[in-house]
């Protein structure tokens, strides 16, 4: 039995609310159960120096957690003077994931910066961030289309992410913190709307896992991502 009493293939309650920030070109409040992330997408008419003059744009991301997003206060990274390794890893993952779904040439010589701020963390902050980031990105691109800044399709596909793991010997979908902290194995899957894989991160926390167990996790992830993509489509409709 899962602590949340969910079925092995059941997502947490997921919501994606678009257009929640007044000033941002795109925004989304994403909730995976008790994990809540505020995502904004900002259009900038500038590029990294190494991209200038190449006729294509860029999508990048930043990620952070509020001090009391967790059970005990976490010191702000700004006050420590540098970002932690986990933060850098996650924001690079978010950026890579979004770029996989964007036609950067159609975007033109512009940059979209996606900011993911974790308000409350209960496991799966990176997967929630990616799923909400796609909605904020789509919101931003819609803003651009409405102003005739782009004429062709920029988004090639949806992108969503979900965690899976082996908890008490059973493959389960969308781990919360109680499960993640006790799981034998946990993995994050980032996938497109048509089921292609962008990235997989998997770790045996206690005991190594078999190929059959990995395939079971992959099957769960495909099911979970398909449901998340449906929710994304409803959010941006």
From Swiss-Prot:
Catalysed reactions, semicolon-separated: tRNA(n+1) + phosphate = tRNA(n) + a ribonucleoside 5'-diphosphate
Described function: Phosphorolytic 3'-5' exoribonuclease that plays an important role in tRNA 3'-end maturation. Removes nucleotide residues following the 3'-CCA terminus of tRNAs; can also add nucleotides to the ends of RNA molecules by using nucleoside diphosphates as substrates, but this may not be physiologically important. Probably plays a role in initiation of 16S rRNA degradation (leading to ribosome degradation) during starvation.
Keyword presence, Nucleotidyltransferase: yes
TM regions (residue ranges): none
Organism the protein comes from: Nitrobacter hamburgensis (strain DSM 10229 / NCIMB 13809 / X14)
Protein name: Ribonuclease PH
GO molecular function, one term: tRNA binding
CDD domains xrefs: RNase_PH_bact (cd11362)
Subunit and interaction comment: Homohexameric ring arranged as a trimer of dimers.
The entry's keywords: Nucleotidyltransferase, RNA-binding, rRNA processing, Transferase, tRNA processing, tRNA-binding
EC number: 2.7.7.56
Signal sequence coordinates: none
Disulfide bond residue pairs: none
Keyword Cell inner membrane: no
GO BP terms, alphabetized: rRNA catabolic process; rRNA processing; tRNA processing
Domain of life (superkingdom): Bacteria
Binding site for phosphate: 86, 124-126
SUPFAM superfamilies: Ribonuclease PH domain 2-like, Ribosomal protein S5 domain 2-like
């Amino acid at each position: 039995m899962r602590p949340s009493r969910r079925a092995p293939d059941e997502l947490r309650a997921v919501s994606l609310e678009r257009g929640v920030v007044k000033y941002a070109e795109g925004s989304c409040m994403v909730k995976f159960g008790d994990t809540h992330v505020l995502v904004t997408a900002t259009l900038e008419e500038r590029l990294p120096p190494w991209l200038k003059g190449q006729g294509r744009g860029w999508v990048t991301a930043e990620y952070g957690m509020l001090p009391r997003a967790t059970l005990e206060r976490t010191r702000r990274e700004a006050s420590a003077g540098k970002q932690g390794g986990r933060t850098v890893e996650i924001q690079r993952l978010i950026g890579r994931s979004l770029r996989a779904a964007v036609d950067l040439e159609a975007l033109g010589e512009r940059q979209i910066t996606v900011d993911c701020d974790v308000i409350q963390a209960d496991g799966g902050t990176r997967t929630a961030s990616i799923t909400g980031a796609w909605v904020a990105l789509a919101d931003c691109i819609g803003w651009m289309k409405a102003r005739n800044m782009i004429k062709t399709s920029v988004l090639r596909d949806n992108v969503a992410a979900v965690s899976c793991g082996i908890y008490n010997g059973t493959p389960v979908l969308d781990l919360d913190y109680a499960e993640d902290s006790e799981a034998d194995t946990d993995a994050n899957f980032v996938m497109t709307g048509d089921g292609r894989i962008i990235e997989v991160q998997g770790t045996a926390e206690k005991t190594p896992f078999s190929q059959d167990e990995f395939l079971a996790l992959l099957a769960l992830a495909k099911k979970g991502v398909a449901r998340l993509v449906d929710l994304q489509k409803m959010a941006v409709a």
